[in-house]
UniProtKB/Swiss-Prot annotation:
Residues recorded as bearing Phosphotyrosine in the entry: 69
Any one GO molecular function term: pyridoxal phosphate binding
Pfam families recorded: Ala_racemase_N (PF01168)
Residues found modified as N6-(pyridoxal phosphate)lysine: 47
Gene3D superfamilies: Alanine racemase
CC annotations in GO: cytosol; mitochondrion
Record function comment: Pyridoxal 5'-phosphate (PLP)-binding protein, which may be involved in intracellular homeostatic regulation of pyridoxal 5'-phosphate (PLP), the active form of vitamin B6.
Keyword Cell division: no
Sites bearing N6-succinyllysine, chain numbering: 125
Family statement: Belongs to the pyridoxal phosphate-binding protein YggS/PROSC family.
Keyword Phosphoprotein: yes
Protein name, per record: Pyridoxal phosphate homeostasis protein
Length: 274
């Protein structure tokens, strides 16, 4: 069974993808029957990795990729080799987004989803920017929740969730609300029971759906990374963000400079576990 980035480097991206997809299906089989029967989406997180590795993963059937930094995503998604070799590619932005970077993000070719809306003001800015682009369909967005309560992580307070989702649905016609996203605390000991941060997101979804009259199966849950994606799927995740297990460990010495407008929180590799 594939566990670490070192094996990925030795055996290749195709082998790693097959192994991850097998583990995804094993986890789906262990999921309680009372959860929505939604096939989890695998987001291959390619941050710090070259275009050739994205193309290799695409060649092995992967279609959805994620990036944490706006500039890196824009450069990678605009790469001529990726544009020509990966016509069906879909990009998710999964990092912290500041309002001054919104227009740059909206210019990303094949942008499919923004997973990290964390305020009404950001939602309004994204809605306006996407509207000006003149798209044929709304941009899919998730609302990010800080379920762990850690200062080092971005996201709404759980108590703010319903109000922000209501605002998006009522006042942002160029956005399509599709789910909730969280990072959660790292290193939870599963012998102590399910990750409480994941459980908190499930509870929030139930409360949200009851309050707004939304069918549960229409609200995705993005939770789980390389170190905990199987547990996340077992408890209900429909979108897992996996990087090093597919592409190998990252060399941060070669990572592109962070967006100049990134704040102190964003400069910390919060989602290094992808």
């Amino acid at each position: 069974m594939l566990r670490g980035g070192s094996m990925t480097a030795e055996l290749g991206v195709g082998f790693a993808l097959r192994a991850v997809n097998e583990r995804v299906q094993q986890s789906v089989a262990r999921r309680p029957r009372d959860l929505p029967a939604i096939q989890p989406r695998l987001v291959a997180v390619s941050k710090t990795k070259p275009a050739d590795m994205v193309i290799e993963a695409y060649g092995h059937g992967q279609r959805t990729f994620g990036e944490n930094y706006v500039q890196e995503l824009l450069e990678k998604a605009s790469n001529p080799k990726i544009l020509s070799s990966c016509p069906e590619i879909k990009w998710h932005f999964i990092g912290h987004l500041q309002k001054q970077n919104v227009n740059k993000l909206m210019a990303v070719p094949n942008l499919s989803m923004l997973e990290t809306v964390d305020s009404v003001k950001l939602a309004d800015k994204v809605n306006s920017s996407w509207q000006k682009k003149g798209p044929t369909e709304p941009l899919k967005v998730m609302v990010q929740i800080n379920t762990s309560g850690e200062d080092s992580k971005h996201g709404l307070l759980p108590s703010e969730t319903i109000a922000v989702v209501e605002h998006i649905k009522a006042s942002c016609p160029s956005l399509e609300f599709v789910g909730l996203m969280t990072i959660g605390s790292f290193g939870h000991d599963l012998s102590q029971g399910p990750n409480p941060d994941f459980q908190r997101l499930l509870t929030l979804r139930r409360e949200l759906c009851e309050k707004l009259g939304i069918p549960v199966e229409q609200v995705e849950l993005s939770m789980g990374m390389s170190m905990d994606f199987q547990h996340a799927i077992e408890v209900g995740s429909t979108n897992v963000r996996i990087g090093s297990t597919i592409f190998g460990e990252r060399d941060y010495s070669k990572k592109p400079a962070l967006d100049k407008t990134a704040d102190a929180k964003a400069s910390v590799p919060l989602v290094q576990g992808h």
